[in-house]
Amino acid sequence: MIQLTHLSKRFGDKIAVNDLNMILEPGKVMGLIGQNGAGKTTTFRMILNFIVPTSGTITWDNRPITQKDKQKIGFLPEERGLYQKLTIEEQILYFAELHGMSRADAKSELTHWLKRLDVVGKASDKVQSLSKGNAQKVQMIASLIFKPEFIILDEPFSGLDPVNTSIMMSEIMRMRDQGAMIIFSSHDMNNVTKIS
C-alpha cells in the first residue's frame, strides 16, 4: 500500500500540491485528472523522490520508500525518454536490467510484449525509426516488462489514436488484475473513468 499524507509542494509563492491525501492499494488503479499545472506530475515526482515535498509523508506499507522499493516501480514519464540510436531490444533490455531483471529473462519476454502491445517493426529496429505511437508503446514496455508492483504513468495516452489508447488501457487493466498498484494522469475524463 502506498500512502500520501498531507502532501504539499510549494515553489516560492506558488502552491503546486496542497494537502494531498490518498491511498493506493494492490490491484487498484487511480486516475488523476486536471489541467496543465494542476500538480499531477509534481505529485509523481514527489513519490519518486525526484523532488522533495514541502510537507507531508509518502510511505510504502507504512514505512518510507527505500531504494530497494524503487526497483519495484515502473514509471512512464510524460517527457518520453527513449535513446533514439538504440534498437527496441537494447532499449527495453537496458531498462529491465536497471530494475533488477536478468537480461536473459527480459529477452525471453520481449517478443511476447511487442506482440501484445502491437508494436509495428522488429526488435532490431532503431527507436528513431518508430512512429510516436510505437515509441510510446516501447516506453510502456520498458516501464512494465520487469513486472513492477507499483506503476506510475504520466499522461500515458497523450497523442495516441483510439486504437493504441485501447491497447494501452488493456495492458494497464491486465497489470491491475495481476495485483499492481497503478496511478496515472490524464486530461481526458473518459480515460480515467474507463480504467479507474
Regions found by a protein language model. Name each.
Residues 166-178:
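Helical segment within the ABC ATPase nucleotide-binding domain
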Residues 151-154:
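Catalytic Walker B motif of ABC-type/P-loop ATPase nucleotide-binding domains
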